[in-house]
Amino acid sequence: MKMLTRLQVLTLALFSKGFLLSLGDHNFLRREIKIEGDLVLGGLFPINEKGTGTEECGRINEDRGIQRLEAMLFAIDEINKDDYLLPGVKLGVHILDTCSRDTYALEQSLEFVRASLTKVDEAEYMCPDGSYAIQENIPLLIAGVIGGSYSSVSIQVANLLRLFQIPQISYASTSAKLSDKSRYDYFARTVPPDFYQAKAMAEILRFFNWTYVSTVASEGDYGETGIEAFEQEARLRNICIATAEKVGRSNIRKSYDSVIRELLQKPNARVVVLFMRSDDSRELIAAASRANASFTWVASDGWGAQESIIKGSEHVAYGAITLELASQPVRQFDRYFQSLNPYNNHRNPWFRDFWEQKFQCSLQNKRNHRRVCDKHLAIDSSNYEQESKIMFVVNAVYAMAHALHKMQRTLCPNTTKLCDAMRILDGKKLYRDYLLKINFTGADDNHVHLCQPEWLCGLGLFVCTQGSHHPFSTPEECCHTQTAPQQVQCQWNWDHILSVLCKHVCANGVQWAGSPRLHHLISVIVNCSSVLVFLDC
């Protein structure tokens, strides 16, 4: 009897009757964006936040979901209009919602591999003249996947995609686990790993001589590996951990309240280091507000510069120091996004929900007791700010396009169209021979090379201030360079750093003593209340 290959066994497992029944509850609810093309890129975005209780999906994630999704569509549009990048080849998309959950994202991602399974025996469907048969109702064959956002999502999806040799580029997943190429051998990213944030956070603590702190991490790969890296850096600097707490995936309010109670049990540890997802950060700050608990927060990019994290709880967030991956706004995206409305954006099935949530109105007649949306409502500078990782989404799409472009030029030298050699993509060849070797100028006019993401290790340092229109200071670009960060030379402005940080931090009852030099932070530029630092890679 002929032995089944691993792929055939997996095929049987995925499409057995029992497995399909387990997915049945989601299929009729699933929304997606499918735009056909000569080559199709998959997309995974946390369009909805994770639900509560038995609900898989929660409210619309306006910035990290809708904006990032539209950034991919924007990049695809720009590439398809480009006469020099993939000329004669149209890129399509298949975009799915992860609902900010790794398990849900894995189920959704089965759509990407289903196309690979149906294409395995495509040669059997050749016409007598040698042309390919027209097959109806078949899934789009995915050339590569852009996403996910959360590290836990990217890890689950990477484990699946590698079995089918489908390259994947994340625009936001920073877990150090994903640097293991022996396990994640089809994964790449346009952001640096968590190690650099952990190192920066430890240096900030050492700078202020905060040697007794508490930590809170989100359960999962992002929070746990991030806080583990921080603890290693803290030990090197003789920083002691008073209590180390975790927030589980249940998203139950009382779990956040209990964490705050545990933190309050250590009254001498007034500084709390957070390596948490954005939704967990928001719930923890809300719990601190309910308890009227005052801490000095030092948080990773899961919080970053998101004003939504502290909305309604500003009084317990003043003085927070948060990190964000340094990026440049993509100005063309601003114009694109501000031109969208429910009447011209029909390709995004989540946009109407986003619009109703953003403007607190109904596009139907007074649904849910809301007022009917005014047709003159618009996205503009008064209600919109570009999400911090839009640049990384755009760069991820362009990275995949440049790799496909070089592959097409090599395999199809005599035509701008797709030749037979590229109709069934060799994902292994695409990833190793082209994607890891791409070199181009990204959306920020900076050098993009996926093999060395450490070159992109700029970190924005934000301070949550009181009495300003925007509660977080906004960093300016620092020492924009195409060279490695260790070659960058900028001057520290210590007086300004102290005036910005100490004014708000020391007001919370935290004593500052001493100013040891931050040996691993080598460059800074200051503008008003903004500080941008680069790590010594």
What is each model feature region?
Residues V372-L461:
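Segments of small-molecule ligand-sensing domains
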Residues V40, E55, A71-F74, E78, ...:
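Acidic, Ser/Thr-rich intrinsically disordered and amphipathic helical segments
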Residues H26-F28, E32, T103, R114-R249, ...:
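Extracytoplasmic ligand/sensor domains, especially the bilobed periplasmic-binding protein
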Residues G226-P349, D353, Q357, I390-V397, ...:
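Extracellular/periplasmic bilobed ligand-binding domains
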Residues G460-C537:
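Polytopic endomembrane small-metabolite transporters, centered on the Drug/Metabolite Transporter
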Residues N27-E32, C57-G58, V93-L96, D129-L141, ...:
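Juxtamembrane membrane-interface segments at transmembrane-helix boundaries in membrane proteins
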Residues V316-A317, S327-Y384, M407, L411-P413, ...:
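Membrane-interfacial loop- and helix-cap regions that link adjacent transmembrane helices
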Residues T5, L10-R114, L140-L141, Y150-S151, ...:
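Signal-peptide-cleavage-adjacent N-terminal segments of secreted and extracellular proteins
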